[in-house]
């Protein structure tokens, strides 16, 4: 193996963060990048090691990585992550935590390099095949992918695991062996330890053939992206919701492709074919007076005003009251709703000395709001302002004593209007 692949993949990258577990693959990657840096003195190279805490050897792995990086004069960042059961399985959760740490560590202008190789590509393809994935899932991994506002590079993706081993032995590299890699209870380990050796014994070039199929699937997806671009433009609103009216006249296949691409744009997990059918039948086609909802993990799909919405699930706060005695400072809201703050300059009057300040999420009675004649109940105001039902009991309402002053970002009541230039604004950082 030469550095030719690295030359191609990293041609324009001069600031590199390498994912470094200390195993064979990432050790070869880091060694290759060190050689690349020697040939290109303007390259800045760092490494990051993720301490998952899953193995009793995790601390010794950190020390090993520190030793290697010190020898190669590569600054090392060690990030410790805490894993909890999120229903996705330990493999998926560890990966999610790992990439979140990568994103948080990247510096401006820096790209992330990871050590996936041809055998990994084959395993990823077969796992997607086992799940019944379509062309998007079977596209597997690309050598370059958008990530955290920059790029994720996989410079070794064309190389086999055997080639990496030969390189490591030839150059006297030392690496660690994660004992969990020998546990074939994990699907990926089962493929690597049992299934792929058997397939390669019969068909030696099986991983390369699978990689070609993945590349063809990716090309088909790019073509579909181009062909459906105008449809997406017609369907997606400036708020990122999906208009239903254009979808009604589409074929099932075309509509499903639009739904998948919309969900991908919202960073949602790719739904199965059955899930797409449920989205259409149970949410999009629900009766007009319904408020349909379909949960996907900690998010949900809703319909409102003939549009589909992808939103984070938040428990209603209808009965919640949050006192705000120090109203001059920001107030943290419950249920991850963010913070509110009263800032100088605005159309709200300041609270009087005898008035207590609080945030609530319901308001009884008839309300009179600035800019509208007559009184109306809060439900009617929400409807007139186009506030979706799920936001109505999570939108902060500012009270002085028992008087409603304002709804964050929606309206000000007559009782809350400032009479001078010393007013304030209610700012909600959701």
From Swiss-Prot:
Record protein name field: tRNA(Ile)-lysidine synthase
Biological process annotations from GO: tRNA modification
Family designation: Belongs to the tRNA(Ile)-lysidine synthase family.
InterPro entries membership: Lysidine-tRNA-synth_C (IPR012796), Rossmann-like_a/b/a_fold (IPR014729), TilS/TtcA_N (IPR011063), tRNA_Ile_lys_synt (IPR012094), tRNA_Ile_lys_synt_N (IPR012795), tRNA_Ile_lys_synt_subst-bd (IPR015262)
Keywords: ATP-binding, Cytoplasm, Ligase, Nucleotide-binding, tRNA processing
GO molecular function: ATP binding; tRNA(Ile)-lysidine synthase activity
HAMAP family, alphabetized: tRNA_Ile_lys_synt
Residues holding ATP: 21-26
Record-linked SMART domains: TilS_C
Catalytic activity from the UniProt record: cytidine(34) in tRNA(Ile2) + L-lysine + ATP = lysidine(34) in tRNA(Ile2) + AMP + diphosphate + H(+)
Annotated localization: Cytoplasm
EC number: 6.3.4.19
């Amino acid at each position: 193996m030469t550095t030719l692949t690295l030359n191609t993949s990293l041609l324009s990258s001069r600031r590199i963060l390498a994912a470094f577990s200390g195993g064979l693959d990432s050790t070869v990657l880091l060694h290759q990048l060190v050689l690349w840096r020697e040939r290109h003195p303007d390259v800045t190279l760092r490494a990051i090691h993720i301490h998952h805490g899953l193995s009793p050897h995790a601390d010794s792995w950190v020390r090993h990585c520190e030793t290697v990086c010190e020898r190669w004069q590569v600054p090392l960042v060690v990030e410790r992550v805490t894993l909890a059961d999120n229903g996705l399985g330990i493999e998926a959760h560890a990966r999610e935590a790992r990439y979140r740490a990568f994103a948080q560590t990247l510096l401006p202008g820096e790209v992330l390099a990871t050590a996936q190789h041809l055998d990994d590509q084959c395993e990823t393809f077969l796992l997607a095949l086992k799940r019944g994935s379509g062309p998007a899932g079977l596209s597997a991994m690309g050598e370059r992918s958008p990530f955290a506002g920059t790029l994720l590079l996989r410079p070794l993706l064309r190389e086999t695991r055997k080639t990496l081993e030969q390189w490591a032995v030839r150059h006297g590299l030392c690496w660690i062996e994660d004992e969990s890699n020998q546990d074939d209870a994990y699907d990926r380990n089962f493929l690597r330890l049992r299934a792929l050796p058997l397939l390669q014994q019969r068909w030696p070039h099986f991983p390369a053939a699978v990689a070609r199929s993945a590349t063809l699937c990716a090309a088909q997806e790019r073509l579909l992206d181009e062909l459906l671009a105008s449809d997406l433009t017609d369907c997606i609103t400036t708020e990122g919701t999906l208009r239903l009216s254009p979808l009604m006249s589409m074929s099932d296949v075309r509509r499903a492709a639009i739904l998948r691409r919309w969900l991908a744009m919202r960073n949602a997990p790719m739904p199965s074919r059955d899930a797409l059918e449920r989205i259409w039948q149970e949410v999009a086609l629900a009766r007009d007076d319904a408020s349909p909802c379909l949960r996907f993990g900690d998010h949900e799909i809703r319909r409102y005003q003939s549009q589909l919405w992808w939103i984070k699930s938040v428990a209603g706060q209808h009965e919640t009251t949050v006192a705000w005695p120090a109203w001059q400072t920001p107030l943290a809201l419950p249920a991850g709703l963010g913070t509110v703050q009263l800032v100088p300059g605005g159309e709200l009057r300041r609270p009087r000395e005898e008035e207590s300040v609080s945030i609530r999420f319901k308001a009884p009675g008839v309300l009179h709001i600035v800019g509208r004649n007559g009184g109306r109940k809060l439900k009617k105001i929400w409807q007139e302002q186009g506030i979706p039902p799920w936001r109505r009991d999570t939108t902060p309402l500012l009270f002085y004593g028992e008087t409603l002053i304002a709804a964050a970002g929606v309206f000000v009541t007559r009782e809350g209007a400032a009479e001078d230039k010393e007013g304030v604004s209610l700012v909600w950082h959701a």
